[in-house]
Design a protein with these regions (language model features):
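Glycosyltransferase donor-sugar binding loop
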Residues: 319-334
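Aromatic "clamp/platform" in nucleotide-sugar-dependent glycosyltransferases that forms part
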Residues: 371
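Acidic anion/phosphate-binding donor-loop and adjacent secondary structure
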Residues: 253, 259, 269-285, 471
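Short hydrophobic beta-strand element within catalytic cores of glycosyltransferases
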Residues: 388-391, 395-402
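Conserved acidic donor-binding segment of nucleotide-sugar-dependent glycosyltransferases
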Residues: 404-420, 429-434
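Nucleotide-activated donor-binding/catalytic signature segment of Leloir-type glycosyltransferases, i.e.
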Residues: 333-353
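Conserved donor-binding/catalytic core segment of Leloir-type glycosyltransferases
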Residues: 278-310, 320-323
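Carbohydrate-associated surface elements
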Residues: 247, 268
């Protein structure tokens, strides 16, 4: 059985929660063959993997969203295809309509090999653009509007024209571009389609666009509408849609996902991983707080640094460890380094990428100040090491800290996001009471053991994979997958397989 995992902007290039989940999932099923379709910004990222690929991953195929020279993994026909009335209405529905004719669009790009550049520069797209302009944007310069509209549909076109992997099951780690690629591949080859959302993609993009400086205000609603249409395509065409917690499932329903397709599947971690890690040095007077995060804006590291600055003034024993890579957004990371220098604050350590086993035992508590999360693996990993956590009230952090249907008690402290004062208060409080830290750590350990074990996640996804395989009459392999000789060492990159 071959599973094609489809991920945008994460595995196997970026270290983080979603990437760790994907890597763990592949490792849980050595009997299955996996291919990875990786959606990335451009070919400059090609092949720069942050993970060593497991032996049952036989292919990595890349889709570049910002590469005007890329042709989707195949050579395009040189002729100009004139749209039929049905095809024109399908493309119009993508831009204007509420209900998109995705099947006609898929056929247009895959079977008729529509030239994306010629379409965007041609009369059919111009006619659609003029209609949108007259309906909604008549007060702005038309040429600016036209080029903005082209820029919106260019990355979607790259996703639609790519040459998909043939597989029995397409497993998308989000909606958005991943969901479109999975929907297209499922339509083309008949494989089952599974969507597993860690955060709710549409809401995350909406928040990002509202705050973004690169999107002019007048176009923000249009961008948001397009992401909603893309997500709705995935919801409607999927065989099953999973979420990590009940509130996320409710958001999926609000965004149009059919209720009967939804299922809650919590994350899982190996609770034995940190059983024998080294602890604090005897007599160490410091209170070590660890943030196992990527140094990126979504983790709100600047708020963390500012909060620590004020907490440190109240308790000199505090020491902050920011444990994770900073290469993803070097400009933001540099701003964080400069903020530490400007505050003249002591005892903040940036470690870069680490092995958690070497650090987590030395921590008294963990902290997560994100402005957006799903169900953070780092909190669950901390619980498995009996470490309490300070977390912002985003995603499922409340459920993890305070519990959902259990009486284990609080496993940390919850704060509002972007609230320097409250986060500083939480650091001081957790430093002040060692007995409370121990109680919280034990509560977290009991919580992770009861509901968030990797064995439970494996069992859940084994049942889902078997259910979808059976529906497509695909036999379930019991033995470990062994690559064919020609596949040994043959991890490919989509841009190289034209």
């Amino acid at each position: 059985m071959k599973v094609c995992l489809i991920a945008e902007g994460c595995y196997p290039y970026v270290v983080g929660g979603v990437s760790s989940w994907v890597h763990s999932l592949i490792g849980q099923f050595p009997n299955l063959e996996f291919a990875v379709t990786a959606i990335i910004a451009g070919r400059e990222q090609s092949g720069k993997f942050a993970y060593k690929l497991p032996p049952n991953v036989t292919e990595v195929r890349e889709i570049y969203l910002n590469d005007c020279e890329w042709q989707g993994g195949r050579t395009r026909a040189s002729f100009r295809h004139r749209l039929s009335r049905t095809e024109f209405e399908a493309m119009r529905s993508l831009v204007i309509g509420d209900s998109v004719d995705w099947e006609t669009i898929f056929r247009l790009f895959q079977e008729k090999q529509l030239s994306l550049n010629r379409f965007l520069m041609g009369p059919d797209f111009l006619k659609i653009a003029e209609e949108v302009y007259e309906l909604r944007y008549g007060s702005i310069v038309f040429s600016d509007f036209l080029w903005t509209l082209r820029s919106i549909y260019l990355p979607l076109g790259f996703a639609l024209q790519h040459d998909p992997v043939k597989a029995d099951l397409y497993h998308c780690v989000a909606t958005g571009y991943s969901g479109i690629v999975g929907s297209l591949a499922s339509w083309k080859y008949g494989g089952a389609l599974l969507i597993s959302e860690h955060g709710i993609y549409t809401r995350e993009r909406e928040e990002e666009i509202i705050k973004a400086k690169w999107v002019t205000g007048v176009y923000k609603d249009f961008w948001i509408e397009q992401f909603r249409k893309m997500s709705l395509c995935a919801y409607q065409r999927a065989d099953l849609v999973t979420s990590l917690f009940e509130d996320a499932r409710s958001l999926q329903l609000d965004l149009g996902c059919p209720r009967e397709k939804t299922r809650v599947t919590p994350n899982g971690v190996d609770i034995t991983r940190f059983a024998h890690v080294p602890g604090k040095e005897p007599g160490d007077p410091m209170i070590h707080i660890g943030a196992a995060i990527r140094v990126t804006p979504i983790k709100d590291v600047k708020t963390l640094i500012n909060a620590f600055y004020y907490a440190k003034q109240r308790d000199a024993r505090l020491k902050l460890w920011i444990m994770g890579p900073w290469e993803e957004d070097r400009e933001y990371a540099q701003e964080c380094f400069e903020l530490v220098e400007s505050l003249h604050v002591q005892d903040i350590v940036f470690t870069g990428r680490i092995r958690m086993e070497e650090y987590i035992g030395r921590m008294d508590a963990l902290i997560l100040t994100s402005i957006s999360e799903g169900q953070p693996l780092v909190i669950l990993e901390g619980f498995s090491a009996k470490k309490p956590c300070i977390a912002t009230n985003v995603g499922n952090c409340r459920g993890l800290i305070y519990g959902e249907g259990d009486d284990f008690g609080p496993a940390g402290i919850l704060t509002p996001p972007m609230n320097i004062e409250k986060i500083a208060d939480a650091m001081v409080a957790i430093a002040a009471d060692g007995d409370a830290r121990a109680r919280m750590g034990e509560a977290g350990y009991r919580r992770v053991c009861s509901r968030y074990r990797v064995e439970q996640m494996r069992s859940t996804y084994r049942a889902i994979y078997q259910e979808l395989a059976q529906a497509k009459h695909v036999p379930w392999p019991e033995d470990s997958y062994r690559p064919h000789p020609e596949q040994e060492g043959g991890k490919s990159h989509g841009g190289n397989r034209n």
